[in-house]
A protein has these predicted regions:
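A membrane-periplasm/extracellular boundary helix in multi-pass inner-membrane enzymes
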Residues: 3-4, 182-188, 250, 271-320, ...
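Loop-to-helix entry and N-terminal half of a specific, functionally important transmembrane alpha helix
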Residues: 174, 372, 398-429, 443-445
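A juxtamembrane structural motif centered on a specific transmembrane helix
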Residues: 1-16, 229, 234, 402-413, ...
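Alpha-helical transmembrane segments of multi-pass inner-membrane proteins
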Residues: 2-8, 13-21, 40-45, 116-127, ...
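Membrane-interface helix-loop-helix junctions at transmembrane boundaries of multi-pass membrane enzymes
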Residues: 48-54, 93-113, 164, 225-239, ...
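N-terminal signal-anchor transmembrane segment
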Residues: 2-96, 121-128
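Aromatic-anchored transmembrane helix interface
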Residues: 80-87, 110-122, 132-155, 168, ...
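Long extracytoplasmic/lumenal interhelical loops at the membrane interface
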Residues: 194-195, 202-204, 318-381
Length: 462
């Protein structure tokens, strides 16, 4: 019994000794900075293990920072940074299990069963996909990353304080992204970078769409929180919203900007209480005026993609300078998806398999997708996969509305639900199912949070 009690201390001591040996070795062999870097990384890892909420949000924002980290630290060219965070996330979930607090709530059973069936279809589709290389990579990313991001919130969000703490982490990361983006814009302006044909501002070299998608979610958070404030706090939130809209416009990404407005409108119609609905309409109208003001006030290099929606963009290709319409390309991709789905009876049910969309093009086995989550699932998982996806959405919406009818959503729950709706609309115009896996994360957080709201109200009235 004594030996059993001292085992954790002994293992911890051996672990510290091993870390010291590795630190000294790498500090001598590689660079003296390792003497400081390794202890910091160890402490950061331990901190993340104890805070799976922050780790999960970091995974959601990896599309912004991953490229920069790979460029600065070549080791992450081999070691996937997202996979490393997933391992840390599961270490945090394992810690919860060891403390006896592990468990998936009973109310999640239906949606988790549907999600498991959908994952099974995704896996099986890899055996008949015409694009095995890109297909299996896509399957692996979805089963490892998306599944972890969907299941984790159901485990670690156990009370309202957990949801509030996660919202505070989200605020911190959002503020960091916004400040970094505004500093980058200031640098572009002062260095003469605006005097070109087209500027699509980004952050750390990330895809502007990924940055804009994150900013749209941040805008939804600021809007939902701002209308619940009074006096100067509401005015401050409006100023922050204007800065976020400036950052979104500067990315040149039209889809996330439209998704922000679509998500807020649907949130107002379905979930917002009558107390704040009029305020949300007012803020929405002001936001539209801010966007139009930015489009007329900013340099043409930043607003070109918004002003030339029907004409398309002038780009340099292997065949020379061409004008390409993103909207026309998207519509063509959707048409190809529908035609492929209806091309034969077997395709109608199970279709191409994961990654199969690229088989319609000359490169065949390549990461390519129709930029719409429904058309993507319809083509690659067939009617069966499409029905499973629709059923998942129906179960989630039914539960959201059920809890909404029982009382007003809390501030933190409103943020998560609004973020889910914004990403849902964004998934209809850009990215594939892996690019939009953050949708599953926000959906799980939103469902967990409103369940905690409901349980809290029941405990008060009991």
């Amino acid at each position: 019994m004594v030996l059993f009690r001292t085992a954790p201390f002994t293992l911890g001591l051996l672990g510290l000794i091993l870390i010291q040996i590795i630190t000294f070795y790498l500090g001598i062999v590689i660079h003296p900075v390792m003497f400081f870097l390794i202890p910091i990384l160890v402490l950061a890892t331990v901190w993340l293990v104890h805070r799976p909420e922050f780790t999960l949000l970091m995974i959601g924002f990896t599309s912004i920072i991953k490229g920069f980290i790979q460029e600065q630290f070549p080791i992450f060219e081999t070691l996937d940074f997202t996979l490393l965070l997933i391992i840390i996330l599961w270490a945090g979930l394992a810690k919860i299990a060891f403390t006896g607090k592990w468990g998936l709530p009973e109310w999640t059973r239906d949606i988790l069963i549907l999600f498991a069936l959908f994952c099974g279809m995704v896996f099986v589709s890899g055996f008949y996909t015409p694009s095995p290389v890109s297909g299996w990579l896509k399957i692996g990313r979805f089963l490892i990353f998306a599944s972890s991001m969907f299941v984790a919130p159901f485990v670690f969000l156990r009370n309202i304080s957990d949801s509030i703490r996660m919202l505070n982490y989200f605020k911190f990361l959002s503020a960091t992204i916004l400040v970094a983006m505004l500093i980058n814009l200031l640098f572009i302006a002062t260095s003469g970078g605006l005097f070109t044909y087209l500027v699509r501002a980004s952050l750390l070299g990330a895809n502007p769409i990924a940055v804009s998608r994150s900013l749209a979610v941040i805008a939804a958070m600021v809007t939902v929180i701002g209308i619940r404030r009074e006096g100067w706090k509401r005015l401050t939130a409006l100023v922050f919203l204007a800065l976020i809209l400036l950052a979104i416009v500067s990315t040149g990404s039209r889809g996330p900007l439209a998704s922000f407005f679509a998500g807020i409108i649907l949130f107002m119609l379905m979930f917002e209480s009558s107390v704040y609905r009029s305020r949300l309409v007012l803020v929405g109208g002001i936001s539209i005026m801010i966007v139009f003001g930015l489009l007329f006030a900013l340099p043409e290099s930043l607003t070109t993609r918004f002003m030339q929606i029907t004409q398309g963009d002038v780009i340099v290709t292997a065949g020379g300078v061409e004008r390409v319409s993103t909207i026309a390309t998207r519509l063509n991709f959707w048409r190809i998806s529908i035609q492929g789905w209806l091309s034969s009876p077997s395709y109608f049910l199970f279709v191409k398999g994961d990654g199969g969309f690229s088989s319609f093009f000359v490169w065949r086995d390549f990461r390519w997708y129709p930029h719409n989550i429904f058309f993507e699932v319809l083509l690659e998982q067939g009617f069966v996969g499409f029905i499973l996806l629709i059923m998942m959405i129906a179960v989630a919406v039914r539960y959201l509305l059920k809890v909404r009818k029982s009382g007003m959503l809390s501030e933190h729950s409103s943020v998560w639900v609004a973020a889910t709706l914004v990403i849902f609309f964004s998934a209809q115009v850009s990215g594939d199912i892996n690019d939009n896996r953050i949708l599953l994360m926000f959906l799980a957080i939103g469902l967990s949070s409103i369940h905690l709201d409901r349980r809290f109200r029941e405990s008060i009235t009991a």
